[in-house]
């Protein structure tokens, strides 16, 4: 995404991150089929085959990326010299409008830590829905493993559409603040409704779809905020810091929901905690961007 200027970044990031939603569309039924079809083959459990067969493509793609993905625009062999100059000039012009920060300033910048906190809150919701969506569908009355996988396609499919539509709306209007916070709020509302209507399949699926749409849409919208603040080596350090802090939620979220489920026999209380995290993330977005109508103005801070 470093080849795109800020005003065009939103749709690009959203299209890139729709891979998360599309992997849910494909991965749900595929995982269910693997677990059913391969259970007992070679003496392995279905989940063991699942890990093997779905892990191999990731390894192969990683190898391909190492050889194919270039470090910079200047090294891209599939661009002409004129295209390289145009892109480099556009990026240089765009970066000139952002504040310059040293690495030391990044780690001492309260706004960067605030962004990391926002990302942590949103990732709490992402991992919660990723790990527990099949279980929530099962709780709503679906017992067959393959049926559960097929039904999980619905929230992820709708989320992929929502991500693109919301990003286009944000780019057209230039408004980032309420788009980002609103996505977090919608995700939180969806999780609360999922807890309330967990026993009704139709209502539960509608609520889970709303939650998934809000959670996944919040992620590409969020990334326009820190990327508009920082540039150069400071951008790499700042984004790495935000990622590191935010992805701690990858451990906290599933563990927390699982612990609540073990203690209460239900995931409902865990859903409410995740909803609270999303609401907090949305509120922090509004606080972090007070007085700024879109992310381009954030650089003036």
Residue spans of the language-model regions?
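Glycine-rich segments within core transmembrane alpha-helices of 12-TM secondary carriers
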Residues: 10-35, 57-58, 243-253
């Amino acid at each position: 995404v470093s080849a795109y200027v800020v005003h065009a970044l939103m749709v690009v990031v959203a299209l890139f991150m729709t891979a998360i939603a599309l992997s849910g569309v494909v991965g749900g039924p595929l995982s269910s089929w693997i677990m059913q079809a391969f259970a007992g083959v070679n003496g392995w459990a279905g989940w063991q085959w699942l890990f093997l067969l779905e892990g191999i493509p990731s390894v192969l793609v990683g190898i391909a990326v190492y050889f194919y993905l270039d470090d910079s625009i200047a090294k891209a062999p599939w661009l002409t010299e004129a295209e390289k100059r145009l892109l480099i000039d556009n990026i240089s012009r765009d970066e000139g409008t952002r504040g310059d920060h040293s690495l030391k300033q990044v780690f001492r910048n309260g706004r960067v830590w605030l962004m990391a906190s926002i990302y942590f809150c949103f990732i709490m919701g992402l991992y919660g829905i990723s790990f527990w969506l099949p279980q929530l569908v099962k709780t709503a009355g679906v017992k067959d493993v393959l049926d559960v996988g097929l039904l999980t396609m619905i929230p992820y499919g709708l989320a992929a559409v929502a991500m693109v539509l919301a990003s286009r709306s944000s780019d057209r209007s230039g408004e980032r603040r309420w788009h980002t916070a609103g996505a977090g709020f919608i995700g939180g509302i969806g999780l609360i409704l999922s807890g309330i209507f967990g026993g009704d399949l139709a209502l539960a699926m509608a609520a889970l779809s709303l939650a998934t749409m809000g959670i996944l849409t919040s992620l590409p919208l969020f990334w326009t905020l820190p990327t508009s603040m920082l540039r150069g080596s400071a951008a790499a350090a700042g984004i790495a810091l935000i990622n590191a802090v935010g992805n701690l939620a990858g451990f906290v979220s599933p563990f927390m929901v699982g612990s609540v489920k073990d203690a209460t026999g239900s995931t409902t209380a865990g859903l409410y905690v995740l909803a609270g995290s999303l609401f907090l993330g949305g509120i922090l977005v509004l606080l972090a961007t007070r007085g700024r109508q879109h992310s381009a103005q954030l650089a003036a801070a």
